[in-house]
């Protein structure tokens, strides 16, 4: 398994466990997989487009982006819970959004775990924003989507 370092990998594995507990049964497994996939794509895109200097070489083997994908999975699952009336999920989405916004403004993650801090900041931002944008776009295109979400 390729990853930044052991502590970063361990943080991601702990995040998987916490996210699983928080969003368990919030949406069908395929929907959760879509959230993770879109979050990872958003994370990778943000890493390449927003890093300093922009790293537009998409040929490199990706070894990062899981933490951004996990942010996307968390936000997507929480939005699914919010659509079902869980108010705490709304507050957690706001908290995650404020966290990634703060990280982007500061240029460093709130919890440092390796040598790729700028990459992690962009990954967290990209993973979160792509889900928020996808959900918003879906509601704009199909206002009748109601509780289904992605």
Q: What are the residue ranges of the model-derived segments?
A:
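Membrane-interface helix-boundary signature
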Residues: 7, 85-92, 113, 117-120
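Alpha-helical transmembrane bundle and helix-membrane interface signal
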Residues: 24-32, 79-89, 140-149
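Interfacial helix-start motif at the membrane-water boundary
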Residues: 1-13
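Hydrophobic cores of alpha-helical transmembrane segments in multi-pass inner/ER membrane proteins
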Residues: 12-17, 70-79, 124-139
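Small-polar-interrupted transmembrane alpha-helices in polytopic inner-membrane proteins
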Residues: 12-76, 91-103
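Alpha-helical transmembrane segments and their immediate juxtamembrane cytosolic regions
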Residues: 2-3, 81, 94-95, 110, ...
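C-terminal transmembrane module of polytopic alpha-helical membrane proteins
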Residues: 103-150
């Amino acid at each position: 398994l390729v990853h930044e370092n052991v502590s970063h990998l361990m943080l991601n594995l702990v995040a998987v466990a916490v996210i699983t507990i928080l969003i368990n049964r919030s949406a069908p497994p395929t929907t959760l997989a879509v959230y993770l996939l879109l979050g990872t794509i958003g994370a990778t895109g943000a890493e390449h487009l927003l890093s300093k200097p922009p790293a537009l070489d998409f040929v490199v083997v990706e070894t990062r982006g899981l933490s951004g994908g996990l942010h996307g999975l968390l936000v997507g699952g929480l939005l699914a819970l919010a659509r079902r009336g869980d108010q705490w999920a709304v507050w957690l989405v706001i908290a995650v959004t404020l966290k990634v916004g703060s990280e982007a403004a500061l240029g460093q993650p709130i919890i440092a775990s390796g040598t790729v801090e700028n990459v992690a900041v962009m990954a967290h931002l990209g993973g979160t924003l792509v889900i928020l944008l996808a959900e918003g776009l879906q509601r704009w295109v199909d206002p009748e989507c109601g509780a289904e979400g992605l």
